[in-house]
Curated annotation (Swiss-Prot):
One cellular-component annotation, GO: nucleus
Primary location class: nucleus
Similarity-based family: Belongs to the vasculin family.
Locations listed in the record: Nucleus
Coiled coil start-end: none
Annotated protein name in UniProt: Vasculin
Domain of life per record: Eukaryota
Organism: Xenopus laevis (African clawed frog)
GO MF annotation list: DNA binding; RNA binding
InterPro entries in alphabetical order: Vasculin_fam
Keyword match NADP: no
General function of this protein: Functions as a GC-rich promoter-specific transactivating transcription factor.
Length: 371
């Protein structure tokens, strides 16, 4: 036998060339599986070397063709590896871009909120700490006050209108009244013609409120012109005016009483007509609404021949009252009987109509059956 028949098959197996590209886990696994298959085939061929031996083709050619390393398997796996690598790179790039955009957006929003908060922060000024800045308080008192003056100067040719005058707070006055600010006293030229006794008396009479309690009486007394007008008013004239108003009111009262009160001198016929027309007389106004039975009683009295005596206005006697009560009771009984009779008669008429309708229906049905 030839020497090569006893040579192991793995000596003739060509070694694959070394590759520089990295393989994925799946590709390595496939290669490991392929190598295990090759080893199984080699072991089988060791024991059965005569199966793959063909002398016509020169030795171990069939076995060599069967176990030749084929690069087609690797070339077929390359597109899947390239596709997976490209997807992995694309997803990683997309995640990086999204994270960058998100971080930029968060930083921009944070900067915006910080700027808004910085603008909203209260800026403390000197007026918030007046006890630390006394010069600011002094400058604040000197402001431009608007005062209304009317009428204007006599020398001005422009039409009379409200003018505006600028001054200090110490000279502030409106419509003849002066207002004191704190405990500051006004100049003495405004109060040259007023005595302190008069000021005190006026302040006691006027009962000035708590707003002026801290101020001396010289600061809130009216000007000379208004003071003179108030002193010129005589309290006696005010009392006379009040008396005239009261007298006018008392004079108009009798006319109102005549229109509102009940006139006992009117005739009884007029009284009955007003009662029938629905007007309520003041004599019965306390009872509320006038009942219909009262109107019937007046009618009954007139039918009995009773009339009111205009001179004596004498009431009814006992006999007349008994007769009136008996007649009224009889009328009430007759009214109730009449009402019951009418109700029964109406019900009887309705019953008769229903019976007649039933009879007519039965007769019409009988005639139709006969036909």
């Amino acid at each position: 036998m030839a020497q090569h028949d006893f040579a192991p098959a793995w000596l003739n197996f060509p070694t694959p060339p070394p590759s520089t590209k990295p393989f994925l886990y799946a590709e390595k696994r496939s290669e490991s599986l392929g190598r295990s298959d090759c080893a199984f085939n080699v072991n089988r061929q060791r024991h059965n070397s005569s199966e793959a031996f063909d002398s016509s083709f020169g030795g171990n050619l069939k076995k060599r063709e069967k176990n030749v390393w084929r690069p087609q398997s690797r070339s077929a796996a390359e597109p899947t590896w390239q596709r997976e690598a490209s997807l992995h790179l694309y997803s990683s790039n997309l995640q990086r871009v999204n994270s960058q955009l998100r971080s930029e957006r968060n930083t921009s929003e944070f900067d915006l909120t910080r700027s808004l908060d910085r603008e909203d922060c209260k800026t403390f000024e000197a007026e918030d700490f007046s006890f630390l800045y006394p010069e600011h308080e002094r400058g604040k008192k000197l402001f431009t006050a608007r005062l209304w003056e009317y009428p204007m100067n006599a020398g001005s040719t422009s039409p009379q209108m409200l003018g505006i005058k600028k001054g200090l707070m110490d000279d502030f006055s409106l419509s003849g009244y002066s207002i004191g600010v704190g405990n500051q006293s006004l100049p003495d030229k405004h109060w040259a013609g007023i005595k302190k006794e008069e000021c005190k008396s006026l302040s006691k009479d006027n009962n000035i409120g708590s707003f002026y309690q801290d101020c001396p009486p010289e600061n809130y007394i009216p000007n000379t012109s208004l003071h003179a007008e108030l002193l010129s008013v005589d309290p006696c004239s005010l009392e006379e005016e009040e008396d005239t108003h009261l007298n006018n009111r008392n004079d108009s009262c009798p006319e109102m009483d005549i229109n509102l009160n009940f006139d006992e001198n009117e005739n009884s016929e007029d009284n009955v007509n007003t009662l029938i027309s629905g007007q309520i007389s003041p004599a019965y106004a306390q009872d509320g609404v006038l009942s219909s039975s009262l109107e019937a009683e007046f009618k009954l009295l007139r039918e009995m021949g009773w009339q009111e005596n205009d001179e004596s206005c004498a009431p009814l006697t006992e006999d007349e009252m008994r007769e009136f009560q008996a007649i009224s009771e009889q009328l009430q009984k007759n009214g109730l009987r009449k009402h019951v009779f009418l109700r029964d008669a109406l019900a009887f008429d309705l019953f008769q109509d229903a019976v007649q309708k039933e009879d007519s229906e039965t007769s019409s049905s009988d005639t139709s059956d006969d036909e």
